[in-house]
């Protein structure tokens, strides 16, 4: 029905990213050329880094800033810069050399000036990877569920329920674990290709 034809950003992210993941898996399946595989895997790994890891860091930054505000603490540029710096160290580790201005990156990210929503990119990416893996492993039955229970659902239910109907339960750790398992397998293959 027309009343349910709209969709929320989370659903749109899952749909587009699922299709991108399916295309990437298709391209990887079609080539054995080391350089082509390395290029494709690098591209896919960057999607993981920027969407799953980085957006999670952004969401944690938003959460920490909100918690400070809720406690009545003064939040200013100095506080935000310190919180962001600590998160960069946590997420990227001590071996990464940071650009001298990276601590100020928080000030130029437009997402931070809107409602708390960047977590949807990371969770949507995890859901999309889980859906794509389901389609690749189960075939036609998963494609049917993806089309009929996810893509066709619009806003007839909340996104988590729609995904559950399509076979991905976002109330569990499984979708994130599946995404991380794929990331690790891609990283292992990249290591082999670079030898």
Model feature map: region roles:
Residues 18-21, 29, 34, 55, ...:
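C-terminal, non-catalytic "cap/extension" segments appended to globular domains
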Residues 6-36, 44-46, 50, 124:
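Post-HExxH zinc-binding segment in Zn-dependent metallohydrolases
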Residues 5-8, 147-149:
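Conserved short loop/turn motifs at secondary-structure junctions
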Residues 45-51, 56, 64:
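Long, K/E/R/D-enriched contiguous segments that form extended
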Residues 1-3:
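Catalytic Zn2+-binding segment of zinc metalloproteases
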């Amino acid at each position: 029905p027309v009343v349910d034809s709209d969709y929320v950003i989370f659903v749109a992210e899952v749909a587009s990213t699922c299709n991108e993941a399916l295309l990437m898996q298709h391209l990887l399946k079609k080539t054995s050329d080391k350089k082509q595989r390395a290029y494709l895997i690098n591209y896919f790994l960057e999607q993981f880094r920027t969407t799953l890891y980085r957006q999670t860091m952004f969401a944690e930054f938003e959460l920490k800033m909100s918690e400070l505000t809720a406690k009545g603490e003064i939040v200013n540029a100095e506080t935000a810069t310190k919180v962001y710096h600590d998160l960069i160290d946590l997420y990227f580790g001590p071996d990464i050399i940071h650009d001298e201005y990276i601590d100020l990156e928080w000030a130029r990210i437009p997402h931070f000036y809107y409602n708390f929503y960047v977590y949807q990119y990371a969770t949507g990416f995890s859901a999309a990877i889980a859906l794509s893996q389901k389609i690749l492993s189960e075939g036609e039955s998963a494609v049917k569920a993806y089309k009929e229970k996810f893509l066709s659902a619009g806003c007839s239910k909340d996104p988590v329920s729609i995904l559950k109907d399509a076979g991905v339960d976002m109330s569990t750790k499984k979708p994130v674990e599946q995404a991380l398992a794929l990331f690790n397998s891609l990283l292992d293959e990249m290591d082999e290709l670079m030898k």
